């Protein structure tokens, strides 16, 4: 039904909608009507002479007509635009103070629910009627749920608002948030309604609310976990173009713990991703969202979330037809915390955010008062710190934060230390009503302020490191303070322009080791020459001449991309015998070979999970993150070596793993067992793990067990494996594939986490970089052959170690596909400075692999 204003605007003599009026009466001029009369001319010649004046009149009339037409068009557009209506939906909740919560309120089909919902809707209608930009345009309100406190009503209200009033309406609704309803409004109902909260909502969130086919209500029973999942999980995909929701409840004075055990929905992209949102309320209001999820997560990813009260709402809004199984989750209730924080009196100790490493609950405040002995000072070291929120600028700690000594800390931070000037310190933790993270893990220590780091160097962050690490060219302090104000030793160090010291042999090695790049300045070759990747200078005529004049192949890389050329050792040979001179054309998404063979057999190197965990104080990998990684167990010895899966029946490993030693026949295939899809060595019987024996071991015939040259072996499984989310092959690089200096590559394995340490239970990962071959030969003289590649950090810290042998070097390419760059072979110690790891260079053996097994 049209409003009074709209009806008036429809009349011929009423309001036109903006205060303009029209009348058909002629205007009076001294009591006479104004008119225009045209008289015939008596003299045609006079008429001809008057022609120009006539044209002026005609042009004036035409101009006036055009102006009036334009004005009329503008007015029509203006009034039409003002009459355009926009659907606006506000979602929120309110408190009903003089009602007690009844169990029947959990059932939206109960009479009690309907009666109370009717009262709430009447009260909302009366509230809106007092707001001029809302009342006339209110269409309907719907109550979706009730919960304790005394009674909290969750609702959404729909409005049909003129386009030009939308901003004003949103502002009016914003001003009504968290308000107490006036007494007159309360008197219109039989209950007291307070604290009305409402926010604009995405209409997709409200769609199909009357359709309960994908709406579920669950109530926790005791402390027993309750399982639920998307419809059809895991055998069929969840519905497309739908809205599903799960209402989770617990008993009064409890909170809920929610964990997604399996999560696989459409990949996050800009096409309107399928989205799972968890709310710390029963109304889908964005400011109360705890987390939003899309994509796929490995089972080991931390997806545990806590509520601040006894309810949670989960929504799944789908807009695609991509086939994904959805999620499986469990929840249970636990007692609400009576307090958070407390007094810690000791010389040292630990504390953490609530429910760490799970996500801390929203809307919480914790304060720890720490006190150490009187004659000491206290420092707090944060070993893990994750307090991130979406769309919050870095350094802007306005939402979740930790406050110490008046300074706030937030976001994701490396290990850092905060200290006091006496024996007491106070740590305050705050989370707001939305978006939580995993929080922090911290320890406090007492120290003597006169000597805070006995026998060590103290970083500006308060961390203590060994004195010999000062001014050694590597930043051991996270704030680089150990490398500030240094005087470099010119005998073996280079002084960067920013005054940092670097090893002299790093100069002109094609890798920028100084932050300002000064170690690579002045290294250019003379005019008309080509600079190789290893720093060597060649005449330009030797570039792209089909010969490896540099020694590292860089002079033959990226030559005549994609064009057929004569075949050499540095070109890519297609199956039809033709060659293309393009760097790494294999499986790059572009057909460079005329027969398309460079894009065949590319079902490899892909991971099923799109999300990986953040590393906290270690290098634990996620389940399924490296699906080609294999654990090799020798009879009676447990895990000894790694391997990589390259086909359903074949693996690659290191030849030195199969050399007989101390009376044990490691060369016998029958003593070995391969575990594929394994993540945790203590869970070899876990679902998804496949166990196989070996049928054959093929060591390279030129393998030298003294120099470790040709350190590669092929292993045939006794029966093929079945590919799954956690078992996939890695891509093998062609013989011409190059891995340039400085490229980031990943090493994985269950080897020792430190030299002389113990093997890891969880699969470890470490990012390392390809090291210049000339530099490597300088560091390990007379030990490096063309079949070897040096990878690591000359600063040490990350490397393969005992037990990692035979495992893969996984090199990520631009499209996310992984190629195996090498095989873990040998090294001097583990992760030592200036002692990079040495790996078997895999492209060198590509033809041998194909000749042996046809892969």
Curated annotation (Swiss-Prot):
GO-annotated cellular components: membrane
Give ranges for the Cytoplasmic compartment.
Answer: 1-55
Q: Where is the Peptidase S1 domain?
A: 615-854
Q: Spell out the reaction equation it catalyses.
A: Cleaves various synthetic substrates with Arg or Lys at the P1 position and prefers small side-chain amino acids, such as Ala and Gly, at the P2 position
InterPro entries given in the database record? CUB_dom, LDL_receptor-like_sf, LDLR_class-A_CS, LDrepeatLR_classA_rpt, Peptidase_S1_PA, Peptidase_S1_PA_chymotrypsin, Peptidase_S1A_matripase, SEA_dom
* E.C. code: 3.4.21.109
Topological relation to the membrane, as annotated: Single-pass type II membrane protein
LDL-receptor class A domain residues are: 452-487, 487-524, 524-560, 566-603
Q: Supply the alphabetized keyword list.
A: Disulfide bond, Glycoprotein, Hydrolase, Membrane, Phosphoprotein, Protease, Repeat, Serine protease, Signal-anchor, Transmembrane, Transmembrane helix
Its assembly, as annotated, is:
Interacts with CDCP1. May interact with TMEFF1.
Task: List, alphabetically, the PANTHER family matched.
Answer: ACROSIN-RELATED, SUPPRESSOR OF TUMORIGENICITY 14 PROTEIN HOMOLOG-RELATED
Protein family (similarity comment): Belongs to the peptidase S1 family.
What's the protein name? Suppressor of tumorigenicity 14 protein homolog
Q: Which organism is it from?
A: Bos taurus
Identify the taxonomic lineage of the organism of origin.
Eukaryota, Metazoa, Chordata, Craniata, Vertebrata
Record gene name: ST14
